[in-house]
């Protein structure tokens, strides 16, 4: 901040100019050469790479339809949540490659990546998705096993006599 030497300096500093550091960030659309939005999502050990483009709602996961990859309806519901919050069901074609972890972690990773990709395609969706917590990386991972114990916290069986 500049030092004020006179009343004129004070008047110049109070002209209403806004400090750029205090302004709200402006989010712009981020698309690749094919007009797709790309984002990565993570959950536990799973990492999902998600591409979205305008279409009729086709969801492909690891080159397979979503109905065959996520056979359990609960996992498909997790995947659909960001689209329902945004009101964009069946408006985007979604292509996903996901690796690592189990099916539940992979579904959470796809949801995280899809939420981020939606905000890259339509920045005005950031507020409702952030309010629901879909843009936040779930940091909970498996606690490591400790030596001298059977698992992370479980002790070996103890016999008194």
UniProtKB/Swiss-Prot annotation:
Disulfide bonds: none annotated. Keywords: Ribonucleoprotein, Ribosomal protein. Gene3D superfamilies: 3.30.230.10. One of its GO terms (cellular component) is cytosolic small ribosomal subunit. Signal peptide: none annotated. Pfam families: Ribosomal_S9 (PF00380). GO terms for molecular function: RNA binding; structural constituent of ribosome. Transmembrane segments: none annotated. One of its GO terms (biological process) is translation. Belongs to the universal ribosomal protein uS9 family. This is Small ribosomal subunit protein uS9. It comes from Methylobacterium radiotolerans (strain ATCC 27329 / DSM 1819 / JCM 2831 / NBRC 15690 / NCIMB 10815 / 0-1).
């Amino acid at each position: 901040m500049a030092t004020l030497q006179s009343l004129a300096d004070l008047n110049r500093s109070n002209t209403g100019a806004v400090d750029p550091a205090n302004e709200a960030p402006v989010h712009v659309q981020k698309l690749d050469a094919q007009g797709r939005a790309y984002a990565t999502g993570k959950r536990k050990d799973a990492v999902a790479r998600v591409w979205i483009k305008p279409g009729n709602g086709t969801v492909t996961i690891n080159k397979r339809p979503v109905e065959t990859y996520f056979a359990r309806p609960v996992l498909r519901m997790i995947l659909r949540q960001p689209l329902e919050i945004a009101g964009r069901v069946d408006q985007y074609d979604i292509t996903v490659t996901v690796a690592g972890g189990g099916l539940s972690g992979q579904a959470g990773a796809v949801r995280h990546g899809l939420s981020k990709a939606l905000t890259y395609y339509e920045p005005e969706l950031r507020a409702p998705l952030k309010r629901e917590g879909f843009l936040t990386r779930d940091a909970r991972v498996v606690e490591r096993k400790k030596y001298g114990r059977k698992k992370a916290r479980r002790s070996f069986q103890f016999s008194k006599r």
